[in-house]
Amino acid sequence: MENLLLNAWSTVGSVVLAILILLVMITIHEFGHYIAGKLLGFRIDEFSIGFGPALFKRRSKKTGELFALRLIPLGGYCAFAGEDGLDDETDTKQEEGEEGDPKKNGEKLSVSEPFPQFQEDGAQPKPSDADRASAANVPSADGALEAHKRDESVAQPSVQTCVGGASEEGNLSEKDKEAPVRTGGEFTKMAPWKRIIVLIAGAFMNYVLAVFLLIVCFFAYGQTMIAVYKAEPTAEIPAQYCLQDYDILLEAQGKKLYLTTDVAQALNGHKAGDLVEMRISRVVGTKEDGTYLREEMDVRIALRADVDVRNSADLDGVWRALGIAYETEGESGVWQLANASYRFGFWETLGRSFAYSFKIAGSIFKVLGELLTGRLGISALGGPLTTISVTSQIAGRSFRGFLEIAGFLGVNLAVFNLLPIPALDGSKVVFTVIEWIRKKPLNRKVEAIIHAVGFVLLLGFAVLVDILQFV
């Protein structure tokens, strides 16, 4: 019973740790948008960590910006003034002389209404700047507004739901309601190049943090490399052309190894009997303290089978060709591989930290390509629940695991948010570039609809891949 309780507490603690990692990554992402916006003169209405009802909120006396900590710790947003762009259309119509008809003047509802771009036409007085600033601090009635906001963060490959509540304007104190008049430009009225910088700033901050964590991890613990736990003995191939127990794989065919897919890429297309060049770290003795004495060496390994890799998950043929032992456990089996920490020199460690981040980013594009071409099924992916599950398992093992998975998630979040998928920062960049080239924006309502539909599809996809993982 005691062990059961300890295991339960350990599991809960690991899950909480995983959620905290995601929350930190999302907060850093939104802070990137925030700091870029401040430096470039944008007016910001709210910076929120989490979604749903506010647990804590405070309005800055100096800037009038609302800072909030909300109940659901699976997202966040940085709300820029005028980012829905409806004011632009209103101003344009007024300049063209469309006055007197409230249906043509394009007055916008308070942002407390869901999807203001779908508002019913009706005569309303145009809100003042102070009213607009106050309204911008009220969360949406059902979270739909936050769903298509530019600054919503999504954890790779998951999409976070936006849980809103009733308007909280009444919950603010009179002191908080008396916000000063803010300075700065509305989002859609700022220069396109400034908007692009703000849009990519979140991903940039995620990447910077991820590389920093990887550098700390690699210098403190070494890089995690693929090691042979047990090699399959054979009398058909001389021992000098075989891998041995506890060999650590460093390079294959002159290419440095970072991920298991790197081994597959280096050996793909080779036939049984081919000799491949590899650099390994091999045990050559034992130190006085009982640890292994290792030596780096270049060896030629004879492949025992053809290597024909179909996708990123198809690695069985690679391990079979290298002579890795395979042991059956019940109805399944396990290749006798292990992870080993390996320390490199100062400059190589620094270079490998950046190279590893590039490899992670490249693997994302590779997997997406395999999905689009049908070479990989969506069952190989995971949604938010899978992300939390895997993160909790790795981060809960050690501080080293915490650093590695945090760095991995940071790169994933950066790359995923820059993909040109509606509702993500990347698609906003695409729309802004098109506007820059055309010298005028696309229809703001159409753009908002595209992002809203994109969000719903992303959410549905995330739920689907999670279901496939747990069914």
Question: Whereabouts are the PLM-identified features?
Answer:
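Small-residue-rich helix-interface/hinge motifs
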Residues: 10-121, 126-131, 137-146, 151-178, ...
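Terminal peptide-recognition signature
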Residues: 29-32, 69, 239, 246-249, ...
